[in-house]
Amino acid sequence: PSMKGETFPLIVARDIRMHFGGSDVLKGVSLEIDKGDVIAVIGPSGSGKSTFLRCLNHLETIDAGELVIEGETLASTDAEGVCRYAPEAEARRICRKMGMVFQQFNLFPHLTVLQNLIEAPMTVKGMARDAVIPKAEALLDKVGLLAKRDAYPSRLSGGQQQRVAIARALAMEPDIMLFDEPTSALDPELTGEVLRTIRQLADEHMTMLVVTHEMNFARDVSTSVVFMDNGEIIEARPAGELFSSPAHPRTRAFLEHML
């Protein structure tokens, strides 16, 4: 990994390749994410954005390349082209450094809001209930939903459910947050409250990778923007530069279509 001062990147993805049903979904994607980076990943549907995100925490399995999370190797490819993952327990531990928020919220419907937050810290991390509850309540307060602590997800709006999902991911105290189109399933009037929550995390210097269709959010909140098309990173630059003067014709065409 490139040494920037005393730190190394939180995530290094090198030449990630993935095939699916005979087609190449990812064609050699490389990206480094440093502490405090907020990276927006944009691009047309089917460009591999979500697949790449899901490869980072092993929800998808890569066919070739290297994934290093906080200096620990999750997957690597040998000289013969064989891709190997860290042993399962180790892979799980490495992936716990990353919190994930999905398009579809994925809250446990049979648990209250508070129970949704304390479940994983108790079962996965083995933390005591008494220690977890104050932290969970603080996170609910942070996303503006402490009053809903005893409600069930079905009683919440989509925007509220997604904010709970963000709080639930944060309850595991990750170093990196991955967002997979967090507002795509929401009614337009509810996207703002979710984006405000993500913006607040950016202000607190949480390291984030956000796959999004929200161009204003990508331009205003992210430190850099990655444009993907057809399984490749076409352009990765500081947000202001990419939006004001895209270097690649495909980026330009996409932005003209979106803005």
Please report, for each region that a protein language model flagged, where it lies by residue:
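Short coil-to-helix segment of the ABC ATPase nucleotide-binding domain corresponding to the Q-loop/switch region
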Residues: 111-119
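Catalytic Walker B motif of ABC-type/P-loop ATPase nucleotide-binding domains
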Residues: 177-180
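A short, proline-enriched helix->beta-strand linker immediately N-terminal to the Walker B motif
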Residues: 171-175
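Conserved ABC ATPase signature
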Residues: 152-156, 160
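Helix N-cap at the start of a conserved alpha-helix in ABC-type nucleotide-binding domains
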Residues: 188-190
